[in-house]
């Protein structure tokens, strides 16, 4: 059975190939990534691309091959190709990038199959890459198999223009508040969640404060007798 990496585009569920090369998500200039001309560090002319790791060729190492072999066997060749965008092993962590349409089905297999048994989802982490066109919003799900003492993670991407990802509440009920927090801070809409409302910010809050395009602001703070202005009013070198 073929288990080659990647074929489904996670933004729309259509079978489009993903490249095996690292994915450039930003270009940083200067040592501190500043965007103006006020760099006084002497490193203002540095240019560094920021990239996500590309697909990892087999063998993956350790139990990772056994996990992917079994997942491919249960899904079947056609469904595997529709579901799995690519497989990345980076710093001893297996990440399975999944088409968002197929996320609940893949998670159900990982939870229920006796040879996999990833019974526990440890949470949901949102990430915003504003320069990753068409894949600006990412959701990452760390999974753990208590039965087999294994850890992997799933990753799903969605565009800013259509920030919808299927909820995993029906598969892992413990994601309830985690998905609410990710919605609150990043604006990812988890379709099928039983009560997708803000959990930390006020209900009438505008915007999602952990997105990189969220405006910097704040209130002044008094500390040891000194008045510290909010971040958007502090001294700059521009």
Swiss-Prot record:
SUPFAM superfamilies: Nqo5-like (SSF143243). Residues 1-11 have a biased composition (Polar residues). The keyword Transmembrane helix does not apply. GO terms for cellular component: plasma membrane. Residues 1-20 are annotated as: Disordered. It is a peripheral membrane protein. It is an enzyme of class 7 (translocase). Keywords: Cell membrane, Membrane, NAD, Quinone, Translocase, Transport. InterPro entries: NADH_DH_suC, NADH_quin_OxRdtase_su_C/D-like, NADH_UbQ_OxRdtase_30kDa_su. Its EC number is 7.1.1.-. It holds the Pfam family Complex1_30kDa. One of its GO terms (molecular function) is NADH:ubiquinone reductase (non-electrogenic) activity. It catalyses: a quinone + NADH + 5 H(+)(in) = a quinol + NAD(+) + 4 H(+)(out). It is found in: Cell membrane. Gene3D superfamilies: NADH:ubiquinone oxidoreductase, 30kDa subunit. Belongs to the complex I 30 kDa subunit family. PANTHER family: NADH DEHYDROGENASE [UBIQUINONE] IRON-SULFUR PROTEIN 3, MITOCHONDRIAL, NADH DEHYDROGENASE UBIQUINONE IRON-SULFUR PROTEIN 3. NDH-1 shuttles electrons from NADH, via FMN and iron-sulfur (Fe-S) centers, to quinones in the respiratory chain. The immediate electron acceptor for the enzyme in this species is believed to be a menaquinone. Couples the redox reaction to proton translocation (for every two electrons transferred, four hydrogen ions are translocated across the cytoplasmic membrane), and thus conserves the redox energy in a proton gradient. NDH-1 is composed of 14 different subunits. Subunits NuoB, C, D, E, F, and G constitute the peripheral sector of the complex. NCBIfam families: NuoC_fam, PRK07785.1. This is NADH-quinone oxidoreductase subunit C. It comes from Mycolicibacterium smegmatis (strain ATCC 700084 / mc(2)155). The gene is nuoC.
